[in-house]
């Protein structure tokens, strides 16, 4: 399916790689249709590695805009295997790329949030900046990733949590793998994953490692009416971190508000990043099991905080951000301590292997 202008007509009309690339090199912001055209060519396999690399480097060098990213997202959705999951859904994810090699905080938080009764639809892949990616760890926990899109949606209804394994839902991304690998630098694709959840969830808690891109990601969410918390640790982590203060972009009703957050405001001590360090998938899965069995410490604190961020995004309440997060942390703690989070994982394992 070709990318289509909402006003009607094929967006490919009158565009070429030299036109788009020269515009970027001249420092001109591109329209959403321009970037959608480029992504459409890439997703079709009709762009060379040189054209893909040139586009990604030129776009990053100029500096991406909300409109440009929105165009890329639109075209990616045109080539994706999408699913429908009824009701209010939330995703907790980080862009990766912070190099910290932490345990899988967003993955553990997703299970805890499911334990509170919220419906979670993750969009995950192999390792980016964690010691192992969400998909790697979930496999070790017993989750079957090799499901059809239809079955993935059914699991969400049966277990209250599911994962869209990126390579199965965005198969056209294979066309960019070589160029991205050869470049070896951050590109726009580092932030597209959280923006292209195949279930098109309406609420997200998203960690963004790149300080340039965090407000852009928030702007894209605002443009499409999502309720989201976008954050970045001031030490560079793509989490709402307990290792430092963070910047938070609160997205509600089409507006973005930027705030500073200090974990000490919700009663948490600052810890060194080493306290959150992970290892391979087997080790990180064991950390998750211990968390769900009630182990306390820095990992639990970080998971409670990021679980709270998702709960606030899904159902914003009254009060300051810190007050809302504190309430969310209490919900998350109850999910762990009551065994509800552990039972959510057990349901998920059973449903994904049924």
UniProtKB/Swiss-Prot annotation:
GO molecular function, one term: magnesium ion binding
Binding site for anthranilate 1: 94, 125
Gene Ontology biological process terms in this record: L-tryptophan biosynthetic process
Residue sites binding 5-phospho-alpha-D-ribose 1-diphosphate per the record: 94, 97-98, 102, 104-107, 122-130, 134
Cofactor requirement: Mg(2+)
Binding residues for anthranilate 2: 180
Gene3D superfamilies hit by this protein: Nucleoside phosphorylase/phosphoribosyltransferase catalytic domain, Transferase, Pyrimidine Nucleoside Phosphorylase, Chain C
SUPFAM superfamilies associated with the record: Nucleoside phosphorylase/phosphoribosyltransferase catalytic domain (SSF52418), Nucleoside phosphorylase/phosphoribosyltransferase N-terminal domain (SSF47648)
UniProt binding sites for Mg(2+) 2: 238-239
Entry EC no(s): 2.4.2.18
Function: Catalyzes the transfer of the phosphoribosyl group of 5-phosphorylribose-1-pyrophosphate (PRPP) to anthranilate to yield N-(5'-phosphoribosyl)-anthranilate (PRA).
Family: Belongs to the anthranilate phosphoribosyltransferase family.
NCBIfam families, sorted: trpD
Official protein name in the record: Anthranilate phosphoribosyltransferase
Source organism per UniProt: Streptomyces avermitilis (strain ATCC 31267 / DSM 46492 / JCM 5070 / NBRC 14893 / NCIMB 12804 / NRRL 8165 / MA-4680)
Originating gene: trpD
């Amino acid at each position: 399916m070709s990318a289509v202008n909402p006003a009607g007509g094929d967006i490919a009309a009158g565009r070429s790689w030299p036109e788009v690339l020269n515009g970027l090199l001249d420092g001109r912001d591109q329209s959403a249709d321009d970037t959608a055209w480029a992504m459409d060519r890439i997703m079709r396999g009709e762009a060379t590695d040189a054209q893909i690399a040139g586009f990604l480097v030129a776009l990053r060098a100029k500096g991406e805009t909300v409109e440009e990213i929105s165009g890329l997202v639109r075209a990616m959705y045109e080539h994706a295997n999408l699913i429908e999951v009824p009701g209010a859904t939330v995703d907790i994810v980080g862009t990766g790329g912070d190099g910290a090699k932490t345990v899988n905080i967003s993955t553990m938080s997703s299970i805890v949030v499911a334990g509170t009764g919220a419906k979670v639809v993750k969009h995950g892949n192999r390792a980016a900046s964690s010691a192992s990616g969400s998909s790697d760890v979930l496999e070790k926990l017993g989750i079957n990733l090799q499901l059809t899109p239809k079955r993935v949606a059914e699991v969400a209804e049966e277990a209250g949590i599911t994962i869209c394994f990126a390579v199965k839902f965005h198969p056209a991304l294979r066309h960019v793998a070589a160029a991205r690998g050869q470049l070896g630098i951050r590109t726009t694709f580092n932030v597209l994953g959280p923006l292209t959840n195949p279930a098109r969830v309406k609420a997200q808690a998203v960690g963004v490692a790149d300080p340039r891109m965090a407000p852009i990601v928030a702007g894209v969410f605002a443009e499409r009416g999502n309720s989201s918390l976008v954050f970045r640790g001031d030490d560079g982590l793509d989490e709402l971190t307990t290792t430092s203060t963070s910047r938070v972009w609160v997205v509600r009703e089409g507006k973005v508000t930027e705030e500073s957050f200090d974990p000490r405001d919700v009663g948490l001590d600052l810890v060194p990043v080493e306290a959150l360090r992970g290892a391979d998938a087997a080790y990180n899965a064991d950390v998750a099991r211990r968390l769900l069995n009630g182990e306390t410490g820095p990992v639990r604190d970080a998971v409670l905080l990021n679980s709270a961020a998702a709960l606030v995004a899904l159902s914003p309440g009254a009060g300051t951000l810190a007050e809302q997060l504190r309430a969310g942390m209490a919900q998350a703690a109850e999910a762990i301590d009551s065994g509800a989070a552990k039972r959510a994982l057990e349901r998920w394992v059973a449903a994904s292997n049924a």
